[in-house]
Amino acid sequence: MKPFLNDDFLLTNETSKVLYHQYAKGMPIIDYHCHLSPKEIYENKTFKNLTEVWLYGDHYKWRAMRANGISEEFITGDASDEEKFSAWARTVPMTIGNPLYHWTHLELRRFFGIDDRLDEKSAPHIWERVNEQLAGGGFGARDLIEKSNVETVVTTDDPTDSLEYHVKLKDEDFNVSVLPGFRPDKAMEINQEGFAAWVRKLETASGMKIANYDDFLKALKNRIDFFHEAGGRISDHAINQMMYTETDESEVRPIFAKVMNGESASPEEECKFKSLTLHFLGTCYAEKGWAMQLHINALRNNSSKMYRKLGPDTGYDAINDQDIAKPLCSFLDSLDRKDALPKTILYSLNPRDNVVISSLCGSFQDGRIPGKIQHGTAWWFNDTKDGMLEQMKSLANIGLLSRFIGMLTDSRSFLSYTRHEYFRRLLCDVIGTWVENGEAPDDIELLGRIVKGICYENAKHYFQFEVKDRLKA
């Protein structure tokens, strides 16, 4: 029987151990999609206790606590931070089989040097030990990022954001590039309450009068230019339901005007607006050399009662089951036939779409940029051992795993970089197992080069992010 979480955790053979310890483990991290706060990074936010750094905003943990019968008072309610931590500690033993059990103990070990298992009995001791370390300094937001060997962090930012803290961080003595990620979801949701008010925010941010749809597009392009100047090289779109239809400005202009006058768009009109707007943005990304991320098939805010009480991103989302192949293919083709298809990363929250996405990527590779169209890493509910393995094997079966740009955290937590370790261990075990089974050659130099590429170098070449001078040496 193997000990829990030992040095060879998830590594089942000698080849995988060599690949991980000699090639993957020491590679820097390019975290090209996360939800960290640039303000907190700039201010090197400190944390008064373990609950603040670990449980605030972490809806993965919140879902597990609710499933374990924990009252909302001890999750998002008025209970003290220590009471909330105790409630989480009672839940942790019940998460065996869920990656939360692994992540929890990896984070305790890697950041705080605590090997004890967290449960109700160990909770007081762990609470005290971690809080002592947090109070002693060296555990601010920047410190935690640097401890994790991170080279680049890309945040998730609305087009109207000032990017004040990204700009300030450029001049800071901080060995990590913190870059903006362009997330124009509010520009797409024409029927969402507050759309017109958001357009006015866009007007202010761009310094441009928005009197019609053409002005709207110009203002969005203005903000893309602004993000580019701040180091932005990537966009992200949350597309809960993929839709696409051929249309043009003459059809969409009156739809935009209608909504700005307080009316709602019909489903057909909404599809036309989203199709043309996303197409326009795609051409802008291609002109700038950006990568476009599409996160597809999430079913969000399913409990209307709790959405009204707590708002979005609080643990009430699920996997959607929309068929995505035809509309996604039509959208990508609309850009490709105009030679305006940017580097694109496709994610689906539904694991049944793995083979669809892997095959679709191959339809639009251009023979110039290696892995131009990427099957994005396992996302959210698939951010598990099985989910990561399924995504990697699907990509390997149908595309080129060797050109994969690897892992991201997609997290609001400064402790989540252990997910990169988790991914790297699984990657090395997949490849190592092929070798042990005689399905791949025992060529450590070749395989090590592939592993280093997936862990770091492929993303570095793919995105071409600005790197601080001190990191180039």
UniProtKB/Swiss-Prot annotation:
<dbReference type="GO" id="GO:0019698">
    <property type="term" value="P:D-galacturonate catabolic process"/>
</dbReference>
<dbReference type="InterPro" id="IPR003766">
    <property type="entry name" value="Uronate_isomerase"/>
</dbReference>
<dbReference type="Pfam" id="PF02614">
    <property type="entry name" value="UxaC"/>
</dbReference>
<dbReference type="InterPro" id="IPR032466">
    <property type="entry name" value="Metal_Hydrolase"/>
</dbReference>
<dbReference type="GO" id="GO:0008880">
    <property type="term" value="F:glucuronate isomerase activity"/>
</dbReference>
<comment type="pathway">
    <text>Carbohydrate metabolism; pentose and glucuronate interconversion.</text>
</comment>
<keyword id="KW-0413">Isomerase</keyword>
<comment type="similarity">
    <text>Belongs to the metallo-dependent hydrolases superfamily. Uronate isomerase family.</text>
</comment>
<dbReference type="GO" id="GO:0042840">
    <property type="term" value="P:D-glucuronate catabolic process"/>
</dbReference>
<protein>
    <recommendedName>
        <fullName>Uronate isomerase</fullName>
        <ecNumber>5.3.1.12</ecNumber>
    </recommendedName>
</protein>
